[in-house]
C-alpha cells in the first residue's frame, strides 16, 4: 500500500524536488500551495494538487479537511522579503513574513495532526540556518525560522509517541522562495552572492534542492523512527552547531 505525503509549499523548488523523489519511491503525494504558484511552477506529473493560502484561515481549514489520512507532512512553505535592517522594516512587512513562515505553518500543522495520528506519521519542517546563525537584514525571517524550530521541538514533545516531528535547516539555496516566495513577491528581490557563499563553505559549493531532499526523505522514513525533536543542519559545513 502506498504511503501518503502532503507537502505544504510543494510547488516551490524544494517542494517540487521532494515531490519527484517521493513519487519515485511510490508515495502518494499531495501538493498544497497557492494557485498562482502552481500555475507558474507546475508540479511533477503524478502528484495531486490542493490550493491553500497561509493568509486565508478558512481556506486552510477546508483544504486540510479534504485530505485523507497521512504518513507524512512536510512544511516547505516560506519566503523572505527585501533585505533591510530592522529599523527600516515596516510592521506590515514583519507580519507578512511571520505569517508566511511561522503562523501559517502552525495553523496547518494543528489542523493536520489528526490525519497523521491515524497512521503514526512524521512531520518535517523546513527551517533555516539563519535561525541559529542570523545575519544582518534578515531579521523577520530569522525570527520566524527560529520560532519554527522551537515549534518543532515543542510539538515533538506534545504528540509523541504517535507522531514524530523533526526539522531540516539548510543554508542558502538559490531558489525563487529565498528570493521572495514564488507567487507572492518578486523572484528577484534579493541579491545574494552565491559565488561568495560557495567560497565560504568547506564543501565549496552552494546547496542544491537535492541536497535538502535526501535528509527530508530520511526523516520521513522508518530509518529515522527513533528520532524526534531534532534538527538536521544541511549547510556544507559552513556552520557547525
Residue ranges and their predicted role:
Residues 89, 134-142, 154, 181:
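Active-site loop-to-helix junction immediately N-terminal to the catalytic Tyr of the SDR YXXXK motif
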Residues 109, 144, 152:
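Active-site helix of classical SDR
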Residues 114, 156-161, 225:
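Alpha-helical segment proximal to the catalytic Tyr-Lys
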Residues 128:
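Residue(s) in the substrate-gating loop at a strand-loop-helix junction
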Residues 217, 228-241:
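Short C-terminal tail/terminal secondary-structure segment
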Amino acid at each position: 500500500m502506498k504511503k501518503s505525503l502532503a507537502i505544504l509549499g510543494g510547488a516551490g523548488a524544494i517542494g517540487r524536488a521532494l515531490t519527484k523523489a517521493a513519487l519515485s519511491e511510490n508515495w502518494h503525494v499531495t501538493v498544497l500551495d497557492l494557485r498562482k504558484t502552481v500555475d507558474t511552477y507546475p508540479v511533477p506529473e503524478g502528484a495531486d494538487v490542493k490550493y491553500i493560502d497561509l493568509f486565508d484561515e478558512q481556506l486552510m481549514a477546508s483544504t486540510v479537511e479534504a485530505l485523507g489520512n497521512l504518513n507524512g507532512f512536510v512544511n516547505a512553505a516560506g519566503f523572505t522579503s527585501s533585505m533591510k535592517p530592522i529599523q527600516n522594516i515596516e510592521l506590515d512587512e514583519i507580519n507578512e513574513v511571520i505569517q508566511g513562515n511561522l503562523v501559517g505553518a502552525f495553523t496547518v500543522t494543528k489542523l493536520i495532526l489528526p490525519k497523521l495520528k491515524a497512521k503514526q506519521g512524521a512531520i518535517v519542517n523546513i527551517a533555516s540556518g539563519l535561525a541559529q546563525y542570523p545575519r544582518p537584514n534578515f531579521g523577520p525571517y530569522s525570527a520566524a525560522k527560529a520560532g519554527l524550530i522551537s515549534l518543532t521541538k515543542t510539538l515533538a514533545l506534545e504528540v509523541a509517541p504517535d507522531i514524530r516531528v523533526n526539522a531540516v535547516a539548510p543554508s542558502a539555496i538559490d531558489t525563487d522562495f529565498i528570493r521572495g516566495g514564488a507567487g507572492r513577491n518578486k523572484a528577484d528581490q534579493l541579491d545574494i552572492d552565491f559565488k561568495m557563499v560557495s567560497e565560504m563553505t568547506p564543501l565549496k559549493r552552494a546547496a542544491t534542492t537535492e541536497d535538502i531532499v535526501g535528509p527530508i526523505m530520511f526523516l520521513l522514513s522508518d530509518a529515522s523512527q527513533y528520532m524526534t525533536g531534532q534538527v538536521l543542519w544541511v549547510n556544507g559545513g559552513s556552520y557547525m552547531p
